[in-house]
Amino acid sequence: MSSKRRAYPQPSYTNGPGSQLGTPPVAGGFQQPNYGVDQLNQQFQGMNVDPNQAAVAGAPQAAAGSPYGYNQYQQPGANANAAHQSRAGNAAGASSYYLQQGNINAALPLNQLYTTDLSRELPPPISDLSLPPPPIVLPAGTTLIPNSETANAQPEYFRSTLNVIPTNSSLLKKSKLPLALVVKPYNALKVEQEDVPVTSDTTISRCRRCRGYINPFVTLAENGRRWRCNFCNLLNDIPSSFEYDEISGTVKNKFDRVELNNAVVEFIAPKEYMARAPQPIVYTFIIDVSINAVQSGLTGTITRTILESLDRIPNKTKTARVAFIGVDSNLHYFRFNEGLDGTEVLIVSDIDEPFLPSPDGLLVNLDENRQAVEKLLIDFPSYFEDTANQGFALGPALKSGHKMISHIGGKLVCFSATLPNIGEGKLSVRDEASVSGKPKEAKTLLSSADSFYKSFAVNCNSSQISVDLFLTSSSYQDVATLSNLPRFTAGQSHFYPAWTSAKNEDVTKLSKEVSDHLSQDIALEAVLRVRGSTGIRMSSFYGNFFNRSSDLCSFPTFPRDQSYVIEMSIEENINKPVVYFQAAVLHSTSFGERRIRVMNLAIPTSSKLNDIYASADQLAITNIFTHKAIETALSSSLPDARDFLVNKVVDILNVYKKELVAGNVSGASPLQLSTNLRMLPILLFSLTKHLGFRADRVPSDHRAAALNNLGSLPIPYLVKYIYPTVYALHTMPDECGLPEKLIQVNEETGEEEEVISTNIMLPEPINDSKSSWENYGLYLIDNSSELFLWVSGNVVPGLVQDLFGTDNLYAIPTGKTELPEFSDEESEFNFRVRQIIGKIRENNDSIVWKNLYVVVGGSSNEPIEISQQRDLMALRMWAYSCLVEDKTGSEPSYRDFLTNLKTKVSQ
């Protein structure tokens, strides 16, 4: 095998009318939008700034005079790929997305409206999916600290669907755009991976009337002795500790306070914010020990994974507690005897009225009982290796777990390979064949089959208990019903269909995800409240939690890998140039501190529809429409949910054509839309073809699991889940798959020098369409859950040799597998592809481990025994379903979808 880089054949493209291929790439790989002549002629007509007016001092030209995504997003070439991967370090840091204007008169120049004809932008410019939202442009003096670059929250934490807020409800209604906030309070699984500033004392200054927290947008009065609330306008006293430290006797500068400088901040809470002292972190593991779980290897894999993860459980204060319950048709408790290494197994067979068989020793301190816990986890599988018990009494086990930890709170972590089939909460297999593909499918198969699970979940929430599910059965498990447990307790459902320990890749995925799940620095006993300026009301809440009151969301434990959406309504006319939003999470940390994480957002207002459209965030809009489509599917039907998504696109296009197309020219294309929204139609179209909504027959467990993911994924993962990312590996540049080279200035010499970073360069994505493919290519598909490596049927033999170590295409392993590992010297191409896969799998804000599926495409030379392999055919169809721009099954292509839209909008 040669390590020499091969020159693989390059695909040749024909640049048709309106092709994006002729557009020069922007540094860093983001493609410059391609505008037609007709649009360029309309640019000044669409401006909301007088073209004769001089540029406003302090206003970046990208926001006032260039197309969305052009000058604003040109990043330095060396580090551009990382430019939009900002994490917590940028949470309160400098941002080019939030701008303050200087010397503003009456008219505030906001983002400019540019029009795109969707029918002329095929294939759609997918580089837009990597861009941040349109900038938020604030008037001068909005922030207490002049020209602060850290006052507004980064979109990774807190973003709005509209970065200009309508001044009245009629304008919002007229726009057909949703008004909602997307909140993701945490952006890494571990505390140390974030850089959110924390107050140095327990002084918390809040408005006496609206209870808003002091923030970078307040104003000072009476020589700095009082602050005026930016939410309700009330004057409040500045705490004396802001200016004088009584302990050290030193004078302080109040303008140095982190809460006055940063959009995202954590307050250390005093005792009055505690209903009780912060509780220890608690994990009660409910483990399926029935014959299904034992034979599939779940029981052994989980106990080994927990054993290997004990050091990763957050336990800085040495107070973490654990308990274990084995479940078949009986409940098997494990009592730890103080001072002894061993444990007792206590079996309760009365599942109708389950009870705790011992008053102590069931829930124990992990640190103090470490040896006994380790021994139990080593011996655990042997207790059940000869079982023939087919029962699984999940309901009674949950009630026992609740009884065990209800005085403290914590987590019930359930591992199941069996449908609950005995005791309270018993479920049965539903008749899918009779309703699949019919309007009543959702209500019959996706609704809860037993009210126990929701009512129990609500009880858990009030007891500060979260429930997490890891479901691994190869047969029906009723994910739709069971997912009520995590949905109302701020947990999550994890679904592993046909899982078996005989497959190393299955074991790797489950083990990594469980281990990362246990290692999260979760917050405990948390509540989320979002407040807005006068005239704005929080009307609907979406995500995994329970609404304790009209505006208070309750989280027994607060996960770090989910996001939440709050829909808003405008109750009163807004007569101020800026409105404010504040999200606050009161919680206990895993290391025993009571804290409040506060996120602040200021957004300008306008009475002009073009301002609203020019600043709309297409990714946040996709997020809220996804939640509302799920709501429609569960309350009505899947066809209604798909119609909802299509109708939203039609409504928005109709408004744009009627109200915003320059001069409303007769005969103008009905598919014109603002450039910053040009990917919204394909995202909503792709959503109709998603596993959760598509019209084709889908097993109800798979559909329910997909809807669970759609309802909790943060925006970057949600977008990829809807519109998968595809990379062409056979044509990638030489630097892809290798560490990125950066140029930096040596502080001592002042000279530029090249530095090798740890960041792996990824290829530029291509469109989700076979028209972007070559029949001799190699493609990597990332759909946020799995990775597909597509090896085309006419692939170059040398490429197969370099990647797999054989030139026989049909000798390579297909299906769920891993690539052979060759060193850089043995095969540079293999090394680079594995580096790319490793980079895609690498994340610090999600526990998901993406399995790799190798798929060999068909060809005219394919042996008949290969073409008759049902598993391979199914695998090809699965991978093809990721190409959402193409016609798949009964679903139309994106081009056909646009044609249908044109008819509907023209009516």
UniProtKB/Swiss-Prot annotation:
- A single Pfam family it belongs to is Sec23_trunk
Has the keyword Protein transport been applied to this entry? yes
What does the entry list under GO cellular component? Answer: cis-Golgi network; COPII vesicle coat; endoplasmic reticulum exit site; endoplasmic reticulum membrane; equatorial cell cortex; Golgi membrane
| Polar residues composition-biased segments | 11-22
Q: What is its main location?
A: cytoplasm
Region Disordered, residue ranges: 1-34
Q: Which family does it belong to?
A: Belongs to the SEC23/SEC24 family. SEC24 subfamily.
**Which PANTHER family has this protein been placed in?**
SEC24-RELATED PROTEIN (PTHR13803), SECRETORY 24AB, ISOFORM A (PTHR13803:SF39)
Protein name (record)? Protein transport protein SEC24
UniProt organism field: Scheffersomyces stipitis (strain ATCC 58785 / CBS 6054 / NBRC 10063 / NRRL Y-11545) (Yeast)
Lineage per the UniProt record? Eukaryota, Fungi, Dikarya, Ascomycota, Saccharomycotina
